[in-house]
Amino acid sequence: MANMRVKFPTLVLLLGIVFLMAVSIGIAYGEKNAIKNHERPQEREQEERDPRQQPRPRHQEEQEREHGREEERNREPSRGRSESEESREEEREQRREPSRGREQEQQPQHGRREEEEEWQPRRQRPQSRREEREQEQGSSSSSGRQSGYERREQREEREQQQEQDSRSESRRQRNPYYFSYERFQTLYKNRNGQIRVLERFDQRTNRLENLQNYRIVEFQSKPNTLILPKHSDADYILVVLNGRATITIVNPDKRQAYNLEHGDALRLPAGTTSYILNPDDNQNLRVVKLAIPINNPGNFYDFYPSSTKDQQSYFNGFSRNTLEATFNTRYEEIQRIILGNEDGQEDEEQSRGQEQSHQDQGVIVRVSKEQIQELRKHAQSSSGKGKPSESGPFNLRSDEPIYSNKFGNFYEITPDRNPQAQDLDISLTFIEINEGGLLLPHYNSKAIFVVVVDEGEGNYELVGIRDQERQQDEQEQEEVRRYNAKLSEGDIFVIPAGHPISINASSNLRLLGFGINADENQRNFLAGSEDNVIRQLDKEVKQLTFPGSVEDVERLIKNQQQSYFANAQPQQQQQREKEGRRGRRGLSFPFRSLFTKLLSTIM
Protein backbone atom coordinates (compact mmCIF):
# COMPACT_ATOMS: atom_id res chain seq x y z
CA MET A 1 0.00 0.00 0.00
CA ALA A 2 2.88 2.31 0.77
CA ASN A 3 4.23 1.74 -2.68
CA MET A 4 0.82 2.52 -4.16
CA ARG A 5 0.69 5.77 -2.22
CA VAL A 6 4.06 6.76 -3.60
CA LYS A 7 3.16 5.89 -7.23
CA PHE A 8 -0.26 7.57 -7.25
CA PRO A 9 1.02 11.15 -6.78
CA THR A 10 3.70 10.47 -9.37
CA LEU A 11 1.05 9.31 -11.83
CA VAL A 12 -1.01 12.43 -11.19
CA LEU A 13 2.08 14.57 -11.75
CA LEU A 14 2.81 12.86 -15.06
CA LEU A 15 -0.76 13.36 -16.24
CA GLY A 16 -0.51 17.03 -15.38
CA ILE A 17 2.70 17.36 -17.37
CA VAL A 18 1.07 15.68 -20.37
CA PHE A 19 -1.89 18.06 -20.12
CA LEU A 20 0.40 21.09 -20.01
CA MET A 21 2.32 19.81 -23.05
CA ALA A 22 -0.93 19.39 -24.98
CA VAL A 23 -1.97 22.93 -24.11
CA SER A 24 1.46 24.22 -25.17
CA ILE A 25 1.20 22.40 -28.50
CA GLY A 26 -2.22 23.95 -29.13
CA ILE A 27 -0.90 27.40 -28.37
CA ALA A 28 2.10 26.84 -30.61
CA TYR A 29 -0.15 25.68 -33.45
CA GLY A 30 -2.24 28.82 -33.08
CA GLU A 31 0.89 30.93 -33.18
CA LYS A 32 1.98 29.22 -36.36
CA ASN A 33 -1.34 29.97 -38.03
CA ALA A 34 -1.12 33.56 -36.89
CA ILE A 35 2.37 33.86 -38.32
CA LYS A 36 1.23 32.39 -41.61
CA ASN A 37 -1.88 34.59 -41.90
CA HIS A 38 -0.62 37.92 -40.52
CA GLU A 39 3.15 38.14 -40.28
CA ARG A 40 3.94 37.22 -43.93
CA PRO A 41 1.41 39.07 -46.12
CA GLN A 42 4.04 40.06 -48.68
CA GLU A 43 4.89 36.47 -49.47
CA ARG A 44 1.22 35.54 -49.76
CA GLU A 45 0.61 38.40 -52.18
CA GLN A 46 3.64 37.33 -54.22
CA GLU A 47 2.29 33.79 -54.43
CA GLU A 48 -1.13 35.08 -55.55
CA ARG A 49 0.46 37.27 -58.20
CA ASP A 50 2.62 34.43 -59.61
CA PRO A 51 0.31 31.88 -61.22
CA ARG A 52 3.23 29.63 -62.11
CA GLN A 53 3.83 28.57 -58.50
CA GLN A 54 2.54 25.14 -57.58
CA PRO A 55 1.07 24.04 -54.19
CA ARG A 56 3.96 23.43 -51.80
CA PRO A 57 4.44 20.13 -50.01
CA ARG A 58 3.58 19.95 -46.31
CA HIS A 59 7.18 19.54 -45.17
CA GLN A 60 8.10 22.79 -46.94
CA GLU A 61 5.20 24.62 -45.27
CA GLU A 62 6.32 23.39 -41.84
CA GLN A 63 9.87 24.57 -42.54
CA GLU A 64 8.54 27.97 -43.62
CA ARG A 65 6.41 28.28 -40.49
CA GLU A 66 9.39 27.41 -38.34
CA HIS A 67 11.44 30.01 -40.15
CA GLY A 68 8.65 32.58 -39.69
CA ARG A 69 8.49 31.89 -35.97
CA GLU A 70 12.24 32.44 -35.73
CA GLU A 71 11.87 35.74 -37.57
CA GLU A 72 9.08 36.71 -35.18
CA ARG A 73 11.36 36.09 -32.25
CA ASN A 74 13.94 38.29 -33.97
CA ARG A 75 11.39 41.14 -34.20
CA GLU A 76 10.36 40.93 -30.52
CA PRO A 77 11.87 43.29 -27.89
CA SER A 78 14.24 40.53 -26.91
CA ARG A 79 16.22 41.17 -30.09
CA GLY A 80 19.18 42.30 -28.10
CA ARG A 81 20.79 38.95 -28.57
CA SER A 82 24.48 38.58 -28.84
CA GLU A 83 26.25 38.22 -32.16
CA SER A 84 27.14 34.66 -31.19
CA GLU A 85 23.44 33.76 -30.94
CA GLU A 86 22.81 35.25 -34.38
CA SER A 87 25.74 33.36 -35.83
CA ARG A 88 24.46 30.13 -34.30
CA GLU A 89 21.02 30.86 -35.77
CA GLU A 90 22.55 31.43 -39.21
CA GLU A 91 24.53 28.20 -38.92
CA ARG A 92 21.35 26.28 -38.15
CA GLU A 93 19.64 27.87 -41.16
CA GLN A 94 22.58 26.97 -43.39
CA ARG A 95 22.42 23.37 -42.19
CA ARG A 96 18.77 23.28 -43.25
CA GLU A 97 19.64 24.31 -46.83
CA PRO A 98 21.19 20.97 -47.93
CA SER A 99 18.19 19.08 -46.59
CA ARG A 100 15.88 21.40 -48.52
CA GLY A 101 17.91 20.80 -51.66
CA ARG A 102 17.68 17.03 -51.20
CA GLU A 103 13.94 17.23 -50.64
CA GLN A 104 13.59 19.33 -53.78
CA GLU A 105 15.55 16.76 -55.80
CA GLN A 106 13.29 13.98 -54.56
CA GLN A 107 10.21 15.67 -56.03
CA PRO A 108 8.94 14.52 -59.49
CA GLN A 109 10.69 15.96 -62.51
CA HIS A 110 7.40 17.08 -64.09
CA GLY A 111 7.21 20.86 -64.10
CA ARG A 112 10.86 21.11 -63.04
CA ARG A 113 11.32 24.60 -64.32
CA GLU A 114 8.29 25.98 -62.45
CA GLU A 115 9.49 24.28 -59.25
CA GLU A 116 12.92 25.85 -59.59
CA GLU A 117 11.36 29.27 -60.01
CA GLU A 118 9.26 28.61 -56.90
CA TRP A 119 12.22 27.34 -54.92
CA GLN A 120 14.71 30.02 -55.86
CA PRO A 121 13.09 33.02 -54.06
CA ARG A 122 12.96 31.09 -50.79
CA ARG A 123 16.69 30.66 -50.84
CA GLN A 124 17.03 34.40 -51.27
CA ARG A 125 14.94 35.31 -48.19
CA PRO A 126 16.79 37.40 -45.56
CA GLN A 127 18.48 35.17 -43.03
CA SER A 128 19.89 37.94 -40.85
CA ARG A 129 18.96 41.46 -39.85
CA ARG A 130 21.57 42.83 -42.24
CA GLU A 131 19.95 41.05 -45.17
CA GLU A 132 16.53 42.14 -43.88
CA ARG A 133 17.62 45.77 -44.00
CA GLU A 134 18.93 45.26 -47.53
CA GLN A 135 15.56 43.84 -48.54
CA GLU A 136 13.75 46.89 -47.15
CA GLN A 137 15.74 49.32 -49.31
CA GLY A 138 13.00 49.40 -51.98
CA SER A 139 12.02 48.36 -55.43
CA SER A 140 15.54 48.66 -56.82
CA SER A 141 16.60 45.37 -55.31
CA SER A 142 13.42 43.61 -56.47
CA SER A 143 13.93 44.85 -60.01
CA GLY A 144 17.51 43.58 -59.84
CA ARG A 145 16.27 40.17 -58.80
CA GLN A 146 13.70 40.19 -61.59
CA SER A 147 16.40 40.90 -64.13
CA GLY A 148 18.37 38.04 -62.61
CA TYR A 149 15.41 35.72 -63.15
CA GLU A 150 15.14 36.83 -66.77
CA ARG A 151 18.85 36.28 -67.29
CA ARG A 152 18.53 32.80 -65.82
CA GLU A 153 15.62 31.96 -68.15
CA GLN A 154 17.54 33.27 -71.15
CA ARG A 155 20.56 31.21 -70.14
CA GLU A 156 18.39 28.09 -69.84
CA GLU A 157 16.90 28.74 -73.29
CA ARG A 158 20.39 29.13 -74.76
CA GLU A 159 21.51 25.89 -73.14
CA GLN A 160 18.47 24.06 -74.50
CA GLN A 161 19.13 25.45 -77.98
CA GLN A 162 22.78 24.39 -77.77
CA GLU A 163 21.71 20.92 -76.68
CA GLN A 164 19.32 20.64 -79.62
CA ASP A 165 22.05 21.85 -81.99
CA SER A 166 24.47 19.30 -80.58
CA ARG A 167 21.91 16.52 -81.00
CA SER A 168 21.24 17.53 -84.61
CA GLU A 169 24.99 17.76 -85.22
CA SER A 170 25.48 14.27 -83.80
CA ARG A 171 22.73 12.96 -86.09
CA ARG A 172 24.45 14.56 -89.06
CA GLN A 173 27.72 12.95 -88.05
CA ARG A 174 26.05 9.56 -87.70
CA ASN A 175 24.60 9.66 -91.22
CA PRO A 176 25.54 12.71 -93.30
CA TYR A 177 23.96 11.15 -96.39
CA TYR A 178 20.38 11.13 -95.08
CA PHE A 179 18.06 14.18 -95.10
CA SER A 180 14.70 13.85 -93.42
CA TYR A 181 11.55 15.65 -94.54
CA GLU A 182 12.12 18.32 -91.88
CA ARG A 183 15.42 19.45 -93.46
CA PHE A 184 13.55 21.52 -96.07
CA GLN A 185 13.44 25.31 -95.74
CA THR A 186 10.26 27.15 -96.76
CA LEU A 187 10.68 29.84 -99.43
CA TYR A 188 6.99 30.73 -99.90
CA LYS A 189 3.89 29.46 -98.18
CA ASN A 190 0.21 30.36 -98.08
CA ARG A 191 -3.10 28.54 -97.86
CA ASN A 192 -2.85 27.50 -101.53
CA GLY A 193 0.52 25.75 -101.33
CA GLN A 194 4.21 26.11 -100.59
CA ILE A 195 7.66 26.12 -102.19
CA ARG A 196 10.53 24.60 -100.22
CA VAL A 197 14.24 23.97 -100.77
CA LEU A 198 16.45 21.35 -99.15
CA GLU A 199 19.51 22.48 -97.25
CA ARG A 200 22.80 22.39 -99.12
CA PHE A 201 24.41 18.97 -99.39
CA ASP A 202 27.92 20.21 -98.66
CA GLN A 203 26.83 21.72 -95.32
CA ARG A 204 26.56 18.22 -93.85
CA THR A 205 29.97 16.85 -94.73
CA ASN A 206 32.95 17.62 -96.96
CA ARG A 207 32.39 14.22 -98.59
CA LEU A 208 29.58 15.83 -100.64
CA GLU A 209 31.54 18.82 -101.92
CA ASN A 210 30.85 17.79 -105.51
CA LEU A 211 27.13 18.38 -104.83
CA GLN A 212 27.55 21.99 -103.71
CA ASN A 213 26.04 23.25 -106.96
CA TYR A 214 22.94 21.03 -106.81
CA ARG A 215 19.78 21.75 -104.84
CA ILE A 216 16.44 19.98 -104.39
CA VAL A 217 13.29 22.13 -104.64
CA GLU A 218 9.77 20.91 -103.84
CA PHE A 219 6.56 22.59 -104.96
CA GLN A 220 3.13 21.66 -103.55
CA SER A 221 -0.21 23.23 -104.41
CA LYS A 222 -3.88 22.59 -103.77
CA PRO A 223 -6.48 21.94 -106.50
CA ASN A 224 -7.32 24.76 -108.93
CA THR A 225 -4.27 26.89 -108.13
CA LEU A 226 -1.51 28.54 -110.15
CA ILE A 227 2.05 29.52 -109.31
CA LEU A 228 2.61 32.96 -110.81
CA PRO A 229 5.07 33.48 -113.70
CA LYS A 230 8.74 33.67 -112.78
CA HIS A 231 12.20 32.86 -114.06
CA SER A 232 15.28 31.69 -112.21
CA ASP A 233 19.05 31.81 -112.57
CA ALA A 234 19.21 28.00 -112.42
CA ASP A 235 18.57 25.06 -114.72
CA TYR A 236 15.77 22.75 -113.58
CA ILE A 237 14.83 19.15 -114.17
CA LEU A 238 11.34 18.78 -112.74
CA VAL A 239 9.36 15.60 -112.10
CA VAL A 240 5.67 15.27 -111.14
CA LEU A 241 5.31 12.92 -108.17
CA ASN A 242 1.65 13.46 -107.35
CA GLY A 243 -1.38 14.87 -109.16
CA ARG A 244 -1.59 16.56 -112.55
CA ALA A 245 -0.06 19.78 -113.83
CA THR A 246 -0.10 22.10 -116.81
CA ILE A 247 3.15 23.99 -117.28
CA THR A 248 3.48 26.88 -119.70
CA ILE A 249 6.94 27.84 -120.97
CA VAL A 250 7.29 31.35 -122.41
CA ASN A 251 10.03 32.28 -124.88
CA PRO A 252 10.52 35.60 -126.72
CA ASP A 253 8.89 34.27 -129.90
CA LYS A 254 6.43 31.62 -128.68
CA ARG A 255 4.53 30.08 -125.79
CA GLN A 256 4.18 26.33 -125.24
CA ALA A 257 1.94 24.49 -122.73
CA TYR A 258 2.30 20.86 -121.63
CA ASN A 259 0.05 18.56 -119.61
CA LEU A 260 2.01 16.55 -117.05
CA GLU A 261 1.03 13.47 -115.05
CA HIS A 262 2.68 11.28 -112.45
CA GLY A 263 6.18 10.30 -113.56
CA ASP A 264 6.46 12.97 -116.27
CA ALA A 265 9.74 14.93 -116.37
CA LEU A 266 10.82 18.10 -118.17
CA ARG A 267 13.96 20.19 -118.59
CA LEU A 268 13.43 23.87 -117.77
CA PRO A 269 16.42 25.95 -118.92
CA ALA A 270 17.72 28.81 -116.81
CA GLY A 271 16.08 32.17 -117.47
CA THR A 272 12.93 30.64 -118.93
CA THR A 273 9.70 32.25 -117.76
CA SER A 274 7.14 29.63 -116.76
CA TYR A 275 4.06 29.08 -114.63
CA ILE A 276 2.51 25.85 -113.31
CA LEU A 277 -1.20 25.12 -112.98
CA ASN A 278 -2.91 22.44 -110.88
CA PRO A 279 -6.10 21.77 -112.89
CA ASP A 280 -7.36 18.90 -110.75
CA ASP A 281 -10.48 19.43 -108.65
CA ASN A 282 -9.54 17.05 -105.83
CA GLN A 283 -5.88 16.04 -105.88
CA ASN A 284 -2.91 18.06 -104.62
CA LEU A 285 0.05 18.64 -106.91
CA ARG A 286 3.60 17.74 -105.87
CA VAL A 287 6.59 18.54 -108.07
CA VAL A 288 10.25 17.90 -107.24
CA LYS A 289 12.97 19.80 -109.09
CA LEU A 290 16.72 19.37 -109.29
CA ALA A 291 18.21 22.88 -109.50
CA ILE A 292 21.64 23.62 -110.98
CA PRO A 293 22.47 27.30 -110.22
CA ILE A 294 24.25 29.35 -112.88
CA ASN A 295 25.74 32.40 -111.15
CA ASN A 296 26.61 31.32 -107.63
CA PRO A 297 27.29 27.68 -106.69
CA GLY A 298 24.54 26.44 -104.40
CA ASN A 299 22.47 29.65 -104.55
CA PHE A 300 19.72 30.63 -106.96
CA TYR A 301 17.02 33.31 -107.08
CA ASP A 302 13.49 33.53 -108.47
CA PHE A 303 12.45 36.71 -110.30
CA TYR A 304 8.75 37.60 -110.47
CA PRO A 305 7.19 40.30 -112.70
CA SER A 306 4.32 40.68 -110.19
CA SER A 307 4.32 42.15 -106.69
CA THR A 308 2.72 40.16 -103.87
CA LYS A 309 2.96 40.01 -100.11
CA ASP A 310 5.77 37.45 -100.47
CA GLN A 311 8.04 39.34 -102.89
CA GLN A 312 8.37 42.43 -105.02
CA SER A 313 8.28 42.68 -108.78
CA TYR A 314 11.64 43.02 -110.50
CA PHE A 315 10.17 46.19 -112.02
CA ASN A 316 10.36 47.72 -108.54
CA GLY A 317 14.13 47.67 -108.88
CA PHE A 318 14.15 50.16 -111.73
CA SER A 319 14.05 53.90 -111.28
CA ARG A 320 11.00 56.01 -112.03
CA ASN A 321 12.56 57.58 -115.10
CA THR A 322 13.58 54.18 -116.49
CA LEU A 323 10.07 52.79 -116.06
CA GLU A 324 8.44 55.82 -117.69
CA ALA A 325 10.81 55.56 -120.65
CA THR A 326 10.33 51.77 -120.86
CA PHE A 327 6.52 51.80 -120.97
CA ASN A 328 6.21 55.28 -122.52
CA THR A 329 3.67 56.40 -119.94
CA ARG A 330 3.40 58.16 -116.61
CA TYR A 331 4.76 56.46 -113.48
CA GLU A 332 1.40 56.64 -111.70
CA GLU A 333 -0.15 54.56 -114.47
CA ILE A 334 2.67 51.99 -114.24
CA GLN A 335 2.30 51.78 -110.50
CA ARG A 336 -1.45 51.27 -110.70
CA ILE A 337 -1.31 48.59 -113.40
CA ILE A 338 1.89 46.65 -112.69
CA LEU A 339 3.48 47.59 -109.39
CA GLY A 340 0.39 48.12 -107.25
CA ASN A 341 0.09 50.69 -104.47
CA GLU A 342 3.08 51.21 -102.24
CA ASP A 343 1.23 49.97 -99.17
CA GLY A 344 0.38 46.74 -101.00
CA GLN A 345 -3.40 47.33 -100.93
CA GLU A 346 -5.85 48.19 -103.67
CA ASP A 347 -8.04 51.24 -103.60
CA GLU A 348 -11.21 50.83 -101.61
CA GLU A 349 -13.46 51.31 -104.63
CA GLN A 350 -11.55 48.61 -106.55
CA SER A 351 -11.56 46.04 -103.78
CA ARG A 352 -15.21 46.52 -102.80
CA GLY A 353 -17.31 43.56 -103.97
CA GLN A 354 -14.33 41.72 -105.51
CA GLU A 355 -12.53 38.56 -104.48
CA GLN A 356 -9.20 38.63 -102.71
CA SER A 357 -6.52 39.94 -105.09
CA HIS A 358 -3.49 37.90 -106.07
CA GLN A 359 -1.30 40.45 -104.27
CA ASP A 360 -2.87 39.39 -100.99
CA GLN A 361 -2.72 35.66 -101.80
CA GLY A 362 0.99 35.49 -102.62
CA VAL A 363 2.84 33.66 -105.40
CA ILE A 364 0.33 30.73 -105.42
CA VAL A 365 -3.19 31.90 -106.31
CA ARG A 366 -6.63 30.43 -106.93
CA VAL A 367 -7.97 30.20 -110.49
CA SER A 368 -11.49 29.77 -111.84
CA LYS A 369 -12.85 26.94 -114.00
CA GLU A 370 -12.99 29.22 -117.03
CA GLN A 371 -9.36 30.24 -116.58
CA ILE A 372 -8.30 26.60 -116.25
CA GLN A 373 -10.02 25.70 -119.51
CA GLU A 374 -8.28 28.53 -121.35
CA LEU A 375 -4.86 27.62 -119.95
CA ARG A 376 -5.25 23.96 -120.97
CA LYS A 377 -6.82 24.58 -124.37
CA HIS A 378 -3.64 24.16 -126.43
CA ALA A 379 -1.55 22.07 -124.01
CA GLN A 380 0.29 18.98 -125.27
CA SER A 381 0.87 15.72 -123.41
CA SER A 382 4.11 13.84 -122.80
CA SER A 383 5.87 12.00 -125.62
CA GLY A 384 4.79 8.62 -124.25
CA LYS A 385 6.71 5.57 -125.46
CA GLY A 386 10.11 5.90 -127.01
CA LYS A 387 13.07 8.22 -126.69
CA PRO A 388 12.47 11.61 -125.02
CA SER A 389 12.19 14.59 -127.34
CA GLU A 390 14.48 17.59 -127.30
CA SER A 391 11.97 19.93 -125.69
CA GLY A 392 8.72 18.32 -124.52
CA PRO A 393 8.03 16.27 -121.39
CA PHE A 394 8.84 12.56 -121.15
CA ASN A 395 7.74 9.84 -118.72
CA LEU A 396 10.25 7.95 -116.61
CA ARG A 397 8.36 4.67 -117.14
CA SER A 398 7.85 5.09 -120.87
CA ASP A 399 10.19 2.19 -121.70
CA GLU A 400 10.52 -1.27 -120.21
CA PRO A 401 12.42 -1.46 -116.88
CA ILE A 402 16.09 -2.38 -117.11
CA TYR A 403 15.72 -4.65 -114.05
CA SER A 404 12.50 -6.39 -113.16
CA ASN A 405 11.06 -9.39 -111.30
CA LYS A 406 8.19 -10.07 -108.91
CA PHE A 407 9.89 -8.05 -106.15
CA GLY A 408 10.40 -4.78 -108.03
CA ASN A 409 11.11 -2.71 -111.15
CA PHE A 410 14.02 -0.42 -112.01
CA TYR A 411 13.57 2.28 -114.70
CA GLU A 412 16.41 4.49 -115.94
CA ILE A 413 16.90 7.17 -118.59
CA THR A 414 20.61 7.79 -119.14
CA PRO A 415 22.10 11.02 -120.58
CA ASP A 416 22.85 9.39 -123.95
CA ARG A 417 19.12 8.63 -124.36
CA ASN A 418 17.87 11.99 -123.11
CA PRO A 419 18.78 15.03 -125.23
CA GLN A 420 17.38 17.40 -122.59
CA ALA A 421 19.79 16.23 -119.86
CA GLN A 422 22.75 15.26 -121.98
CA ASP A 423 24.66 18.52 -121.53
CA LEU A 424 23.90 18.42 -117.78
CA ASP A 425 25.28 14.85 -117.52
CA ILE A 426 22.29 13.74 -115.44
CA SER A 427 20.36 10.48 -115.50
CA LEU A 428 16.89 9.83 -114.09
CA THR A 429 15.81 6.63 -112.33
CA PHE A 430 12.51 5.44 -110.94
CA ILE A 431 12.52 2.39 -108.64
CA GLU A 432 9.53 0.37 -107.47
CA ILE A 433 10.15 -2.12 -104.64
CA ASN A 434 7.21 -4.24 -103.56
CA GLU A 435 6.46 -4.79 -99.89
CA GLY A 436 8.96 -7.25 -98.43
CA GLY A 437 11.32 -6.83 -101.38
CA LEU A 438 15.04 -6.02 -101.35
CA LEU A 439 17.12 -4.16 -103.91
CA LEU A 440 20.27 -6.29 -103.78
CA PRO A 441 23.59 -4.71 -102.72
CA HIS A 442 25.29 -2.84 -105.54
CA TYR A 443 27.38 0.25 -106.22
CA ASN A 444 27.70 2.85 -109.00
CA SER A 445 31.04 3.26 -110.70
CA LYS A 446 31.05 7.07 -111.08
CA ALA A 447 27.55 8.54 -110.62
CA ILE A 448 26.36 10.21 -107.41
CA PHE A 449 22.64 9.61 -106.91
CA VAL A 450 20.29 11.93 -105.04
CA VAL A 451 17.22 9.84 -104.20
CA VAL A 452 13.78 11.22 -103.23
CA VAL A 453 11.24 8.97 -101.51
CA ASP A 454 8.06 9.33 -103.55
CA GLU A 455 5.83 6.94 -101.63
CA GLY A 456 5.97 4.14 -99.06
CA GLU A 457 8.31 3.17 -96.26
CA GLY A 458 11.48 1.14 -95.90
CA ASN A 459 15.10 1.43 -94.89
CA TYR A 460 18.48 1.42 -96.56
CA GLU A 461 22.04 0.45 -95.66
CA LEU A 462 24.99 2.31 -97.15
CA VAL A 463 28.58 1.12 -96.70
CA GLY A 464 31.31 3.73 -96.36
CA ILE A 465 34.91 4.05 -95.22
CA ARG A 466 36.10 6.02 -92.22
CA ASP A 467 38.01 9.26 -92.72
CA GLN A 468 41.75 8.76 -93.02
CA GLU A 469 42.35 11.02 -90.02
CA ARG A 470 40.14 8.84 -87.85
CA GLN A 471 41.75 5.70 -89.19
CA GLN A 472 45.14 6.91 -88.01
CA ASP A 473 43.81 7.70 -84.54
CA GLU A 474 41.64 4.58 -84.26
CA GLN A 475 43.64 1.89 -86.00
CA GLU A 476 42.21 -0.80 -83.76
CA GLN A 477 38.68 -0.20 -85.12
CA GLU A 478 37.24 -1.40 -88.41
CA GLU A 479 37.54 0.89 -91.41
CA VAL A 480 34.16 -0.06 -92.89
CA ARG A 481 31.14 1.80 -91.54
CA ARG A 482 27.42 1.23 -92.12
CA TYR A 483 25.05 4.18 -92.58
CA ASN A 484 21.39 3.25 -92.30
CA ALA A 485 18.10 5.08 -91.91
CA LYS A 486 14.37 4.50 -92.05
CA LEU A 487 12.71 5.97 -95.11
CA SER A 488 9.32 7.62 -95.47
CA GLU A 489 7.65 9.90 -98.01
CA GLY A 490 9.56 13.12 -98.61
CA ASP A 491 12.91 11.90 -97.25
CA ILE A 492 16.08 12.26 -99.33
CA PHE A 493 19.36 10.35 -99.25
CA VAL A 494 22.58 10.44 -101.25
CA ILE A 495 24.43 7.45 -102.72
CA PRO A 496 28.08 8.41 -103.34
CA ALA A 497 29.93 6.72 -106.18
CA GLY A 498 31.57 3.43 -105.23
CA HIS A 499 29.57 3.05 -102.00
CA PRO A 500 27.63 -0.26 -101.81
CA ILE A 501 23.97 0.12 -100.91
CA SER A 502 20.89 -2.04 -100.39
CA ILE A 503 17.26 -0.93 -99.96
CA ASN A 504 14.36 -2.96 -98.59
CA ALA A 505 10.69 -2.03 -98.48
CA SER A 506 8.42 -2.45 -95.46
CA SER A 507 5.56 -1.25 -97.72
CA ASN A 508 5.34 -0.62 -101.45
CA LEU A 509 8.22 1.80 -101.97
CA ARG A 510 8.72 4.22 -104.88
CA LEU A 511 11.97 6.16 -105.32
CA LEU A 512 13.01 8.95 -107.71
CA GLY A 513 16.73 9.29 -108.39
CA PHE A 514 18.84 12.04 -109.99
CA GLY A 515 22.22 10.70 -111.15
CA ILE A 516 25.00 13.32 -111.13
CA ASN A 517 28.02 12.72 -113.39
CA ALA A 518 26.09 9.83 -114.90
CA ASP A 519 27.70 9.52 -118.33
CA GLU A 520 29.13 6.01 -118.77
CA ASN A 521 28.16 5.05 -115.23
CA GLN A 522 28.07 1.32 -114.54
CA ARG A 523 25.97 -0.38 -111.87
CA ASN A 524 27.75 -3.36 -110.27
CA PHE A 525 25.74 -5.85 -108.21
CA LEU A 526 27.40 -7.79 -105.40
CA ALA A 527 24.85 -10.62 -105.29
CA GLY A 528 22.33 -12.31 -107.55
CA SER A 529 22.45 -14.61 -110.53
CA GLU A 530 23.09 -11.83 -113.11
CA ASP A 531 25.46 -8.85 -113.34
CA ASN A 532 27.26 -10.10 -110.21
CA VAL A 533 30.88 -8.91 -110.11
CA ILE A 534 31.77 -11.32 -107.28
CA ARG A 535 30.61 -14.20 -109.42
CA GLN A 536 33.02 -13.19 -112.19
CA LEU A 537 36.12 -13.58 -110.02
CA ASP A 538 38.48 -16.39 -110.90
CA LYS A 539 38.33 -19.44 -108.65
CA GLU A 540 41.96 -18.96 -107.64
CA VAL A 541 41.22 -15.36 -106.66
CA LYS A 542 38.15 -16.44 -104.67
CA GLN A 543 40.32 -18.91 -102.79
CA LEU A 544 42.82 -16.16 -101.93
CA THR A 545 40.14 -13.57 -101.15
CA PHE A 546 37.73 -15.37 -98.80
CA PRO A 547 38.44 -17.59 -95.77
CA GLY A 548 36.10 -20.34 -97.01
CA SER A 549 36.94 -22.96 -99.57
CA VAL A 550 36.31 -22.36 -103.26
CA GLU A 551 33.45 -24.86 -103.22
CA ASP A 552 31.77 -23.11 -100.29
CA VAL A 553 32.19 -19.71 -101.93
CA GLU A 554 30.72 -20.98 -105.22
CA ARG A 555 27.79 -22.60 -103.43
CA LEU A 556 27.11 -19.44 -101.41
CA ILE A 557 27.18 -17.19 -104.48
CA LYS A 558 24.83 -19.46 -106.43
CA ASN A 559 22.46 -19.78 -103.49
CA GLN A 560 20.68 -16.54 -104.51
CA GLN A 561 18.75 -17.41 -107.65
CA GLN A 562 17.07 -14.00 -108.03
CA SER A 563 18.66 -11.01 -109.74
CA TYR A 564 18.52 -7.30 -108.81
CA PHE A 565 15.52 -7.73 -106.48
CA ALA A 566 14.95 -10.48 -103.92
CA ASN A 567 12.98 -11.43 -100.83
CA ALA A 568 14.13 -9.30 -97.89
CA GLN A 569 13.55 -12.09 -95.31
CA PRO A 570 13.75 -15.49 -97.02
CA GLN A 571 14.81 -17.48 -93.94
CA GLN A 572 11.99 -16.09 -91.79
CA GLN A 573 9.47 -16.83 -94.53
CA GLN A 574 10.67 -20.41 -94.89
CA GLN A 575 10.47 -20.88 -91.13
CA ARG A 576 6.90 -19.53 -91.06
CA GLU A 577 5.91 -21.83 -93.92
CA LYS A 578 7.35 -24.85 -92.09
CA GLU A 579 5.57 -23.93 -88.89
CA GLY A 580 2.32 -23.45 -90.81
CA ARG A 581 2.56 -26.88 -92.45
CA ARG A 582 3.48 -28.49 -89.12
CA GLY A 583 0.57 -26.77 -87.42
CA ARG A 584 -1.91 -27.91 -90.05
CA ARG A 585 -0.68 -31.51 -89.78
CA GLY A 586 -0.79 -31.40 -85.98
CA LEU A 587 -4.34 -30.08 -85.87
CA SER A 588 -5.77 -32.36 -88.53
CA PHE A 589 -5.45 -35.60 -86.50
CA PRO A 590 -7.29 -34.51 -83.32
CA PHE A 591 -10.11 -32.97 -85.33
CA ARG A 592 -10.43 -36.10 -87.46
CA SER A 593 -10.51 -38.41 -84.42
CA LEU A 594 -13.02 -36.14 -82.67
CA PHE A 595 -15.26 -36.16 -85.72
CA THR A 596 -15.03 -39.98 -85.90
CA LYS A 597 -16.02 -40.35 -82.25
CA LEU A 598 -18.95 -37.98 -82.75
CA LEU A 599 -20.23 -40.00 -85.71
CA SER A 600 -19.90 -43.27 -83.79
CA THR A 601 -21.89 -41.81 -80.89
CA ILE A 602 -24.67 -40.69 -83.20
CA MET A 603 -24.81 -44.07 -84.95
UniProtKB/Swiss-Prot annotation:
The keyword Cell cycle does not apply. Keywords: Allergen, Glycoprotein, Seed storage protein, Signal, Storage protein. Residues 137-147, 381-393, 564-574 have a biased composition (Low complexity). Residues 36-105, 148-172 have a biased composition (Basic and acidic residues). Residues 36-177, 343-363, 375-399, 564-583 are annotated as: Disordered. Gene3D superfamilies: Jelly Rolls. Glycans are attached at N504. Residues 177-335, 394-554 form the Cupin type-1 domain. One of its GO terms (molecular function) is nutrient reservoir activity. The keyword Glycoprotein applies. Residues 1-30 form the signal peptide. It comes from the Eukaryota. Belongs to the 7S seed storage protein family. Component of globulins complexes which accumulate in seeds. Seed storage protein. Accumulates during seed development and is hydrolyzed after germination to provide a carbon and nitrogen source for the developing seedling. The variability of the residues taking part of IgE-binding epitopes might be responsible of the difference in cross-reactivity among legumes. This is Conglutin beta 2.
